[in-house]
Amino acid sequence: ALIERGCDVISQHSDSTAPATTAEENGVWQVGYNNDMIEAAPKASLISARIDWGIYVTEAVQAMIDGKEIPTDWCKGLGDEAVYLSPLNTDIAAEGTQEAIDEAKEKLISGEIHVFEGPLKGTSPEGETIEIAEGDYYHEQEEKSAPSWCYIVEGCLVVE
């Protein structure tokens, strides 16, 4: 449905190659999650975000060894190397893409930019609204590890 409606970049939160291969079959780009999808769809897959659970497992095992409580609400990210990017598919990426990714990554780690940065407005499926002012951002996962962004951002196309 997304591709039919004109979406030219597909991503997913699944452990399946189906979005990547579907993107390739339809001539659109794909950004993976949890697995590098370049082998599955070399003409469509640009890059993937991945989680390094080894960092959490190491902390949990160390907590057990030390007789401490195992952390169950765990928040780590790019700066902690708990989230990382697979290598960029340089065979299909535009010139300068790696440099742009590196710059954005540095700014995210330093806190210079944020994922949900204002100004933006959104509405949750329950009708709750949020408005983030210029210069402010949504503080997701600072107090809990579960994703908490559930808003449809004003101006985004919703496909049902």
PLM region descriptions:
Residues A1-E160:
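A residue-level marker of the well-folded mature domains of exported/periplasmic proteins
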